[in-house]
Curated annotation (Swiss-Prot):
NCBIfam families: PRK00418.1
Keywords tagged on the record: Metal-binding, Zinc
Lineage: Bacteria, Pseudomonadati, Pseudomonadota, Gammaproteobacteria, Enterobacterales
Species of the source: Photorhabdus laumondii subsp. laumondii (strain DSM 15139 / CIP 105565 / TT01) (Photorhabdus luminescens subsp. laumondii)
Cofactor(s), names only, from the UniProt record: Zn(2+)
Protein name as it appears in the record: DNA gyrase inhibitor YacG
Keyword Zinc assigned: yes
GO molecular function, one term: DNA topoisomerase type II (double strand cut, ATP-hydrolyzing) inhibitor activity
Subunit structure: Interacts with GyrB.
InterPro entries for this protein: DNA_gyrase_inhibitor_YacG (IPR005584), Znf_NHR/GATA (IPR013088)
Amino acid sequence: MSELLTIECPTCGKTVVWGEISPYRPFCSKRCQLIDLGQWANEEKRIPSQSENSDSDDWSGQPEQ
């Protein structure tokens, strides 16, 4: 008999079973999933990086030669 793995919802902290019975995992609900998506869309969350790329017109995305 295996024990169910549980985690905390990253948005509200509610306990979530990690498995097929939790379709929004790691979130507890669609609401928490959408809250997280909104935070990314509003740039409240970001993936840290070494360089600071700006949105200026002179940034081409190409490495300097």
